[in-house]
Design a protein with these regions (language model features):
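Conserved class I S-adenosyl-L-methionine
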Residues: 203-213
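Conserved SAM-binding motif I beta-strand of class I
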Residues: 230-235
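Conserved beta-strand signature within the Rossmann-like core of class I S-adenosyl-L-methionine
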Residues: 300-312
Length: 367
């Protein structure tokens, strides 16, 4: 372990008279026990905490999805990598010569490692749930829930439900309804947008979701906002489009929700009130981000919300592993940053739950 030096005990050695010298090991302490204790002490001096996993943490780490809620009928047979619809989407996306179709993170090897198709709402590439919370997951989720509900002025927690389908980890606290990371993130994002730009007061609200994933926010917003007139989902990853088509159909979202294929991006609407990008641009190249920003700018969308994976700045993910800043690229397209704040606004809470995501809200200048 770098920076940690372990002082080994004196090992008993033979004397010339056949007896051995007294060991400096504590009475009845085995070598393995001593090594474990010394390793933990050395790690602590280096700022590393070594601790035993509790049973709760072992359960969450053992599997990446919650299978306590069975899959709907036919889901396992349909949600397969060899589904003809997915194969067709992949071929169409691979044939595109646009930056949004060239992936630096969401490549086939990444998806094979980080996504179980039938359990796409589990802890995976779309929504980090258990791996991000680590030990004491239930306690950390409880604290995050209290923070989100404190700002739930729209009372979405009373309108939206969590059923745990497709592998979502759910948590129950007392008589409260089940919550999940999917649900809490959605409640938080919708309330934030309403507080900043009056989302619920816009007649015939139109939303563009770039990097929509499996359709999490589309499902929640269409269920919670009666003024929603149009919600378009688009994603540069064929698997995401495939899952989004399935999930929005399964949830029976209204016709106002559309899933637009990347190879038909010209079918996007001409007018939107807000564009959202949640944990997506951070996983794209700078060229792909600029391509998407051009689509936003040419429609003169008044508001743009970006939630990156990086806590310090808006950054891309390049093939060589570098992460390039792209805030200026947003500003260069006629936008100004009007608000940035942590998604959890208590400094003490963020340290306890170790979630440091930020909201970045931009407004088009001159509106």
């Amino acid at each position: 372990m770098a920076g940690v030096r372990l002082q080994l005990p004196t090992v008993p050695s033979p004397r010339t008279d056949g007896r051995i010298t007294r060991s400096k090991l504590p009475y009845r302490e085995s070598m393995s026990t001593w090594l474990r204790r010394q390793t933990k002490a050395g790690a602590a001096r280096a700022g590393i905490m070594v601790s035993r996993l509790d049973e709760e943490s072992r359960r969450y780490i053992a599997v990446n999805h919650n299978d306590s809620v069975p899959l709907p009928a036919g889901a396992e047979d349909f949600l397969r990598r060899d589904n003809p619809r997915l194969v067709e989407l992949e071929a169409a996306y691979d044939a595109l010569a646009i930056p949004a179709a060239a992936h630096t993170q969401w490549r086939p090897s990444f998806l094979r490692k980080n996504l179980a198709m039938s359990w796409f709402r589990g802890d995976n590439a779309y929504v980090w749930q258990i791996r991000q919370l680590g030990r004491a997951t239930r306690l950390r989720m409880y604290l995050a829930m209290l923070d989100v509900l404190e700002r739930d002025d729209l009372r979405l927690a009373e309108k939206l439900e969590e059923d745990g389908l497709f592998g979502a980890w759910t948590f129950e606290f007392g008589d409260r309804p089940s919550v999940s990371r999917d649900l809490l993130d959605s409640i938080n994002e919708i309330n934030y947008l309403d507080d900043q730009m009056g989302l619920t007061s816009i007649d015939e609200l139109r939303v563009l979701d770039i990097g929509a994933g499996y359709g999490r926010l589309a499902h929640r917003m269409s269920a919670g906002l009666p003024n929603l007139a149009a919600y378009d989902c688009i994603d540069g990853v064929a698997t995401s489009t495939f899952l989004c088509e399935y999930y929005t159909r399964f949830r029976q979202v209204p016709e106002s929700v559309r899933v637009i294929r990347l190879d038909r991006h010209e079918e996007l609407g001409e007018r939107y009130d807000v564009a959202v990008n949640i944990h997506s641009f951070s996983e794209c190249s700078i060229d792909a981000i600029r391509w998407w920003l051009d689509r936003i700018a040419e429609r003169q969308i008044p508001w743009l919300l970006i939630v990156p994976n990086t806590p310090d700045e808006l950054r891309s993910t390049e093939l060589d592993g570098s992460m390039l800043p792209f805030r200026q690229d947003v500003l260069d397209r006629g936008y100004e940053l009007v608000d940035t704040r942590p998604i959890h606004q208590s400094d003490e809470l963020r340290e306890l739950i170790d979630l440091h995501d930020q909201f970045y809200l931009f407004r088009r200048t001159g509106i």
